[in-house]
């Protein structure tokens, strides 16, 4: 029986501290996390690597999370999308989910709530956390 591999997550946020925190938290939860600081960087990574989940900020320096979701779904149509943002009103949250996306968390959120949302979205896709995986997907950050 083949071993499960780590679920691959791409987190896109223009705030470097948020990217580092997300990579650390989800890495500790046994996910393989890569980060991007822009729409352009996210699209580059998504064209090279197959992901299981995208975690997107709504407001990015070079676009919106909603527009990025649409673009990412063109490249990887079956990947779950979790919005993670501090800027959304109830209306904006509903709009984002109606257009493109599977779930929404408003910053700040507790670690347990974040891990639960990620696990639930991955479970809907039939993906669990790897146990004793030999595959390593390092947490990364864009160059300074």
Could you say what each language-model-derived stretch is?
Residues 38, 64-67:
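Acidic catalytic/metal-coordinating carboxylates
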Residues 67, 88-105, 116:
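Alpha4 helix (beta4-alpha4-beta5 surface) of REC/receiver domains from two-component response regulators
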Residues 91, 109-118, 126:
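C-terminal output helix
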Residues 66-77:
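Short amphipathic alpha-helix used as the core "switch/output" element in two-component signaling
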Residues 35-53:
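Acidic, metal-coordinating helix/loop segments flanking the phosphotransfer/catalytic sites
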Residues 16-34:
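Two-component/phosphorelay signaling modules centered on CheY-like receiver
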């Amino acid at each position: 029986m083949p071993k499960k591999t780590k679920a691959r997550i791409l987190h896109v946020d223009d705030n470097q501290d948020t990217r580092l925190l997300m990579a650390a938290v989800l890495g500790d939860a046994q996910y393989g996390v890569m980060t991007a600081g822009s729409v352009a960087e996210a699209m580059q990574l998504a064209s090279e690597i197959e992901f299981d989940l995208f975690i997107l900020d709504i407001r990015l320096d070079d676009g919106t999370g909603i527009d990025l979701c649409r673009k990412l779904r063109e490249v990887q149509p079956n990947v779950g999308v979790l919005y993670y943002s501090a800027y959304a009103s109830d209306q904006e949250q509903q709009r984002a989910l109606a257009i493109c996306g599977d779930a929404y968390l408003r910053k700040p959120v507790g670690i347990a709530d974040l891990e639960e949302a990620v696990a639930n979205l991955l479970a809907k896709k039939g993906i669990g956390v790897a146990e004793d995986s030999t595959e390593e997907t390092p947490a990364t950050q864009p160059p300074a």
